[in-house]
Design a protein with these regions (language model features):
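Conserved short strand/loop->alpha-helix "switch" segment adjacent to the catalytic nucleotide/phosphoryl-transfer site
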Residues: 1, 73-97
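Acidic ATP/Mg2+-coordinating residue in the GHKL
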Residues: 129
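Short beta-to-alpha transition helix within the HATPase_c
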Residues: 25-32, 36, 49-70
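A short beta-strand-to-loop micro-motif at the C-terminal edge of the catalytic HATPase_c
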Residues: 117, 165-171, 177-179
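ATP phosphate-binding glycine-rich loop and adjacent ATP-lid/helix-beta elements
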Residues: 138-170
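Short alpha-helical "switch" segments that flank and position catalytic residues
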Residues: 1-20, 101-118
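Conserved polar catalytic motif of the HATPase_c/GHKL fold
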Residues: 94-102, 106, 150
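Conserved transmitter core of two-component histidine kinases
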Residues: 66, 72-79, 84, 124, ...
Length: 181
């Protein structure tokens, strides 16, 4: 076995059957798929666009990529948002990703409107979907919903507040207020 370019290994000199060859091909395809998934996850956690061009462009790029593959119509408008420090930009990006992910996975919504604006010394991120909604108070009492807890923690880390308006059958609205400091 010797390393080939790209980090793959050649099984030269070994006697193999057709079944062995098929198994190696399947394993190679599986490993290639895992590598691609890791790259995708890594890119979603910290996309190069976020570092190079900022949070607004990174969100727009993510939404553009989704619109080609998902039935969900996403609208993103922003107004007066200043350049943000890296930590705040990452947290806001991940908040938006979690909201989009939850909308796709749970809400069965047709649209998701995202608005991000500056009001005096606050950044206001507001999202609204027309999905199935959920009982927010019950989820809070039961301490369920890992994504929701993650979102609350991110808002708290930025010394912000997150408000949720949702009920079964009525869609979900998130309002996240973050001080500009």
């Amino acid at each position: 076995m010797s390393a080939a370019p790209g980090g793959k290994f050649k099984l030269s000199g070994l006697e193999t059957t057709a079944d062995d060859h098929d198994a190696v091909e399947q394993a190679t395809a599986y490993i290639d798929d895992i590598i691609q998934r890791i790259r995708d996850i890594s890119n979603n956690l910290m996309p190069g666009t976020l570092v190079r061009k900022g949070v607004l462009y990174a969100i727009e790029e993510y939404i553009d990529g989704l619109s080609k593959n998902e039935a969900l119509k996403i609208s993103f408008v922003h107004q007066g948002v200043p350049e943000l420090d890296k930590a705040k930009a990452i947290n806001i990006y991940r908040l938006v990703m979690e909201i989009i992910h939850n909308t796709l996975k749970h809400a069965k919504a047709g649209f998701l409107d995202i608005e991000f604006k500056r009001e005096q010394d606050m950044l206001i991120l507001t999202t609204q979907d027309n999905g199935s909604g959920f009982d927010y108070e019950t989820m809070k009492l039961n301490n369920s919903g890992l994504g929701l807890r993650s979102m609350l923690n991110r808002a708290e880390v930025m010394e912000g507040d997150m408000y949720v308006e949702s009920s079964p059958g009525k869609g979900t609205k998130y309002i996240i207020e973050i001080p500009i400091t």
